[in-house]
Amino acid sequence: MTSLTIDLLSVLRREPWLYNNWFVTTHRWEVNLTFHLLTSIELWVQMRGIPLLYVCEETALEIAHELGKILTLDFHDSTTTQIAYIRVRIRFGITDRLRFFQRIIFDFGEAALISFQYERLRRICSSCFRMTHHRNSCPYRQIEPLHRVTNSTAQRNVREEVFMRDENLRSSMNSQSQMSESSFPTPIDPPPRIPHPPLNPDELVAAYYPHTRATSLPNFAGPLPQVPLRKNVDERDSNIQPFSGPAFAAHSPRLVEVGESSRQGENTQNVHTVEKGDSSKRKNMGGPRFKDDARKSNEDEHMNGGILKPPKKR
């Protein structure tokens, strides 16, 4: 109740009012006022999604007419600058269902989905889209029939739920539990393998016998035996004897490296080495034992195909 007409009009102009986030309907005081008059509410609605070519007063009025009774249109073709949405004040019945989307086909066959946004709307029934009650107390919602469940059925359902939960947990923790014959398709046969290339005897000889010619060995049809090999070491200050093992054939020609004496055979030993600085008288010393050893070494070199000195010219 208010005594001033200005305040009364201000209250009516600023509705709808809210109490505990629910709409409150208002009506101007009249004599013999009854509750049957409080059956409507006025809301501001924003219409969005109208194509730019059809944004005008005529289009807004035609679309808003489908919602309810139009009270005020807050749009003018000559003065309005914003066209993102059009505001219109509409009177709804308190039991009417609110509409939030509508598909409209225009004259040239262009279709558009128009959305409606209600200002100050806080609560609404998500089942019937009415603004008078909550979903939990909706009288228009169909009540789902309750099935009578016995104790044995309830226990069986609980066991099945526990089993499925454990199975899902086990599957997530161990990916191999999901493998079965129906989980994966049949694998494709692998392509045929390319045969290995034949062995090259020259490369094998170079790897196993670095000081022997490849032509002196037979053609290898399989892998060679693993024989430990050592390189010949011939140094002046070293006492290591050259290796002569079973890998070197007796009839194979012997290779002589640069700086190696041709008189030194495979099975001979270096005796009586002459060091630098010795006198000529000491070189001729040795006795009959030295001569016998020299004669044997010459015979061994002759048998092994060693190089002999040519006779002296007279």
UniProtKB/Swiss-Prot annotation:
Q: Where is the composition biased (Low complexity)?
A: 171-186
Where is the segment annotated Disordered? 170-203, 258-314
Composition-biased stretches (Basic and acidic residues) = 289-303
Bias regions of kind Pro residues — which residues?
Answer: 187-200
Bias type Polar residues, positions: 261-272
Instruction: Name the chain's protein.
Output: Uncharacterized protein At4g02000
Which organism was this protein described from? Arabidopsis thaliana
